Amino acid sequence: MAADESSQNTLRLQFKAMQEMQHKRLQKQMEKKREKELSLKSRADDQEEPLEVSDGLSLLHAGEPNSKNSFEKRVLEDEIEHLRNELRETVDENGRLYKLLKERDFEIKHLKKKIEEDRFAFTGTAGVAGDVVATKIVELSKKNRLLMAESEGAKTRVKQLTNRIQELERELQTALTRLSAKGATDAGAKPPRAQMGDRALLETPEVKALQDRLVATNLKMSDLRNQIQSVKQELRMAQKVLAREVGEDINVQQLLSSPGTWRGRAQQILVLQSKVQELEKQLGQARSQSAGTASDELSVYPDPRKLSAQEKNLLRIRSLEREKQEGLEKLASERDVLQRELEELKKKFEGMRSRNKLLSSEMKTLKSQMGTLVEKGRHDDELIDALMDQLKQLQEILGSLSLQEEKTRVSQHHLDQQLNSEAQRSNSLVAQLQAMVAEREAKVRQLEMEIGQLNVHYLRNKGVGEGSSGREVSPAYTQFLEDPGLTKSPASAGDHVGRLGSSRSVTSLGHTLVESALTRPSLPSPHRTSPRFSDSPEQKGWQAQVSEIKALWQAAEVERDRLTEFVTVLQKRVEESNSKLLESERKLQEERHRTVVLEQHLEKIRLEPGKASASQRAAPRTKTGLPTSNNRHNPTGSEKKDPSFAQLSDVPVESQMEELTTRLAIQVEENEMLKAALGSALRGKEEDFRMYHEILGQVKSVFLQALRQQKTGKQ
């Protein structure tokens, strides 16, 4: 604003100086007018004296045309001076307009430099914020282009005004030449003085300054000629076509500016032929009239030698009067033409004045617009600084979020690898267990076959008298089978199922720990914009982008929290599964050891059949103690207590067989329980994978909903 005020003050001072120069010029012109009038009067007096001496009649006839000529010359001089004044005013206005245009060009260049600096400053930004900054810069560049277009329009108008000034100067020069020619016909000594005055006017410093300006404008026009060569070629082609129709050496602008309708070559030829015929008729009439007058004069004055001096003077006076009348008629026609031209020039000057007023008003509006643009640019700079700070903060937040996402991805990758490895291990364990179960089933079948063979052998060795003992053994055998102590294997299975249920409760906890993104409380925005910038549309756009980034951040946090919870659940499951696998491996080792012991004991029984009968007799005595031992037997107790070789050797064969059958049944049940546990573990892992996919789907849905809300808010 200070620069605008200083420029306005300088323009005012320059305008005052120009006005003073114009006043001085007017004073000089008035003095020159007075000198010219005095010189004209003195010349008229000098011419009147010999005429009075010659004859009184000649004074009367000669005074009238001199007064008419002087009046016409004064009128023409006044009009010329008026035109010169108008030219000076237009030149001054053009000078002011040039200065204003230069100032606007300087301001536009300054704004362009600022915009380029802002562009270089914003090239480092990326993402959505960079796109918004780029759109802002594009809008500012569009505004600058509009201003440049307006300034170019003003420049073209000024150039048109300068061209018009040149045309007016040419017309003035032609008018001066006409006046000099007329003055030469009327008075011999007058033209040199007028030409000297015109030369003095042309040699003034203001005229030189105008000529320098004209030279500068011509140089500028020469720079633009290179750009107009293509247009000139097209114009040449059009001019060739017009020359075929209109004729050569004809200005197209005159044809366009002519008020009448345009006529072709054939029509012009017809019109010119009619005009030639009319002029020939007029010439014939004029010749006949001149011949008639000459014959009358000859008839009245047959011989000029016989005429007296007075008659000769009268004839001479009449001829002079005729010549003067013809000259006056010509001058009157020329005066009418000049008056018409002056009226046209006045109209054009009025149009130029109105146009200059419009240009001045437009320049004022441009000044106001430039002031508003400067203020807006300052506000935009402040806004851009604030937005840049927010962008930096958001970039830092995004960087931290990206690091967290990378960490979560790495952890997920490790988890996937662990899960895959665990699945492979579990599959391998299942295959091993299946193979072991098949082996055990084969061994059980072999043992059953051997037991059947032993029973048959035992029954053959026994006699009929030993049937009572057999009857006593059979209820013991049935009692041993129906003993409730042997039904503790389902309890162990129930314990195992309880453990599996606890592991499944962990999976249920895994489900409950995950919260939906819609029920999650929205986090407060860490960086809020200042309220003074909340009304602008640019700030609304930035707020929309910030809200989008917040939505991304919230979704990432939800996903991170849920993944951490899922990781903790999976770690717990892995620990539990590892503990279970260790327990199952330990149990398998114990069962293998037991099977080896049983196989050894069976081989001893085969080798010692006599000892078996003795031990069978002692079976009723140990009948009450056996159920207690069987009641105490369970999968967990077998892990803590193993029967010694001495105890197994003391037990009779039938009880040993019953105990072996019960143990085999227990082992089969345990194998089935292990199979069920492995199947439940696999199902739990499948559910965990499904839950993980559901988590990802929920996070995606939350993110899409946030994006849709942002889009609807923008619209």
Swiss-Prot record:
The keyword Iron-sulfur does not apply. One of its GO terms (biological process) is cytoplasmic microtubule organization. Its main location: cytoplasm. It is found in: Cytoplasm, Cytoskeleton, Microtubule organizing center, Centrosome, Centriolar satellite; Cytoplasm, Cytoskeleton, Cilium basal body. Residues 16-105, 134-458, 554-608, 653-683 form a coiled coil. Residues 20-65, 482-541, 607-645 are annotated as: Disordered. The modification Phosphoserine is found at S258, S469, S536. Residues 625-637 have a biased composition (Polar residues). Keywords: Cell projection, Cilium biogenesis/degradation, Coiled coil, Cytoplasm, Cytoskeleton, Phosphoprotein. Required for primary cilia formation and promotes the localization of the ciliopathy protein BBS4 to both centriolar satellites and cilia. Interacts with PCM1, CEP290 and PCNT. This is Coiled-coil domain-containing protein 13. It comes from Homo sapiens.
